[in-house]
Amino acid sequence: MEAMKMKLYVVVLVAVIAFSTVHQTVAAVDAPAPSPTSDASSFIPTFFASVAVMAFGFFF
């Protein structure tokens, strides 16, 4: 039961990251490009993707 909960957590986390990426892509089409010195648009999804990969490697 515990392993199933962990796998469900990972699947939900990956789905949230995928949705965030799609949402940002759609928002990026409407918005002007950020300045080259601003990495705010890529920091949050990169952080969650890194955490998801580390968690996946740790648990599986």
Swiss-Prot record:
Cell compartments where the protein resides: Cell membrane
Glycosylation sites: P32, P34, P36
Main location: membrane
Topology in membrane: Lipid-anchor; GPI-anchor
Signal peptide range in chain numbering: 1-28
Propeptide: 39-60
Record note on disruption phenotype: Formation of abnormal long root hairs.
InterPro entries registered for this protein in UniProt: AGP3/12/13/14/21 (IPR039281)
GO biological process terms on file: root hair elongation
Record PTM 4-hydroxyproline, positions in chain: P32, P34, P36
One GO term describing the cellular component: plasma membrane
Disulfide bonds: none
Superkingdom as given in the UniProt entry: Eukaryota
Modified how: Contains 4-hydroxyproline; hydroxylated on Pro-32, Pro-34 and Pro-36. O-glycosylated on hydroxyprolines; noncontiguous hydroxylproline residues are glycosylated with arabinogalactan.
Lipid moiety-binding residues (GPI-anchor amidated serine): S38
Protein task: Proteoglycan that seems to be implicated in diverse developmental roles such as differentiation, cell-cell recognition, embryogenesis and programmed cell death. Involved in the regulation of root hair elongation.
Family: Belongs to the AG-peptide AGP family.
Name of this protein: Arabinogalactan protein 14
